[in-house]
Amino acid sequence: MTNLIKNVKDAFNSVLSYAPTHILQAPGRVNLIGEHTDYNDGFVLPCAINYQTVVAAAKRDDNIVRVVSVDYGNETDEFDITQEITFQENKMWSNYIRGVVKCLIGRGYEFKGADISVSGNVPQGAGLSSSAALEVVIGQTFKELYNLDISQAEIALNGQQAENEFVGCNCGIMDQMISAEGNENHAMLLDCRSLETTAVSMPEDMSVVIINSNKKRGLVDSEYNTRREQCEEAARIFGVKALRDVTIEEFNAKAHELDEMVAKRARHVITENDRTEEAAKVLASGDMKRMAVLMAESHASMRDDFEITVSEVDTLVDIVKNVIGAEGGVRMTGGGFGGCIVALVPPMLVDEVKAAVEELYEAKTGLKESIYVCQATNGAGLVL
């Protein structure tokens, strides 16, 4: 993060010609287990990772917000918070910032302008929530600059609202919530219905290894919508609000009445919820052998019942599994059809995992992976 801090400070100084008063950060995240459970009112178990979006900021006396994007060649954006805040077709990055500010005002918070420079190293397009980190760090910035009486949960909800309503991208609450509320060496069990969060301690020094298959993700939107409709249909047949309310026993008793495809989708969600709740318990007790089993079962369920993995991702999981055995867990993470796998790896096996993936993955698939070795880190806050 030191480089990011230097970059935002330098950009602030050179473009705005004075020094910032505050440095803030918000992290990206990875979901350890609990896939496609969020929109079924279920449970997820993400952790924040030490790839961040960092902001240098200072208050202004007027109502202007000026933003410098270091990652877009110090491109700037400027808007007046007393005027209508509008969507910018030609500066997509600035819409996340405009949206967050607009939603804060809409929620009744009062503040004046700010000068902001921003840079991040959360890999984009890898499903590690670079957009949520940006939304959360901007909310955090106005909280700190103006001592706003806003909770971390509300900063997260405000970011989600900005993405849904202003940017126009439909997302659940997980990404913003873990970015706002993460804890070092902890994952977070999030109940997507009540939004209740529980910090879950992780074995000390456990590496969180994220490997991007770099398989271009096709069909994501249409397939995602189909899965969602199938889950809603299953919930209707069971007469419940969401699949969260169906036990595996209830499912087994009625599965024969469901369309075969709908039954497979529902079985994934119902068993994944059970796995996620159990994973929170076994992770906290340091039982990595059981965690390994749960992550393997999660992957198999995504592959066979939810049918969202692809051969490249399955190959990556197998390569890592062969190295770590029962010492750690590995599975696909994210929406599916490409994207990343996540592995919990004891530190002494990290180099071996990297070597195996580098030797075998490209040879088997023709694609070159990207590897990120992370630790579970703190959520958003002041750095300086």
UniProtKB/Swiss-Prot annotation:
It catalyses: alpha-D-galactose + ATP = alpha-D-galactose 1-phosphate + ADP + H(+). PROSITE patterns: GALACTOKINASE (PS00106), GHMP_KINASES_ATP (PS00627). Gene3D superfamilies: 3.30.230.10, GHMP kinase, C-terminal domain. It comes from the Bacteria. It is found in: Cytoplasm. Substrate binds at E35, H36, T37, D38, Y224. The keyword Transferase applies. Keywords: ATP-binding, Carbohydrate metabolism, Cytoplasm, Galactose metabolism, Kinase, Magnesium, Metal-binding, Nucleotide-binding, Transferase. Pathway: Carbohydrate metabolism; galactose metabolism. It holds the Pfam family GHMP_kinases_N. ATP binds at S69, G125, A126, G127, L128, S129, S130, S131. HAMAP family: Galactokinase. Catalyzes the transfer of the gamma-phosphate of ATP to D-galactose to form alpha-D-galactose-1-phosphate (Gal-1-P). This is Galactokinase.
